[in-house]
Amino acid sequence: MQATKPAITGAQIRAARAFLHWSVQDLAERCGVSESAISRAEKMDGVPSMQGRNLNAVRTAFEIHGIEFLDSTGLRIRPR
């Protein structure tokens, strides 16, 4: 059984996007979530009130590009 990953926060979404030098549009294209939904999520304190599948799509887009989320505190590049 796979462990559930903790939800990511708006601050982590902003930080991961900045780390990868992605615009909101870049992230939206990579994860299939609207730019407006991403912008709203980034402005929220804590876990965004975004549909679970959208939040998972955002997380997956970052993880594919090497981002590893650390609980609700930060992120890093996944070691190879």
Residue ranges and their predicted role:
Residues I13-D26:
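Short basic helix-loop element that most often maps to the first helix and adjoining turn
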Residues E42-R53:
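Short, charge-rich, low-complexity interaction segments located
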Residues G52-F69:
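DNA major-groove recognition helix of helix-turn-helix/homeodomain DNA-binding modules
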Residues I8, R30, R40, T60, ...:
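Cell-envelope/extracellular anchoring and linker segments
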Residues I67-R80:
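Helix-turn-helix/homeodomain-like alpha-helical modules used for DNA recognition
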Residues M1-I8:
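A detector for short, charged/polar N-terminal pre-domain segments
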Residues A18, G32, K43:
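Residue-level detection of the helix-turn-helix DNA-binding "recognition helix"
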Residues S23-R40:
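Short alpha-helical DNA-recognition segment
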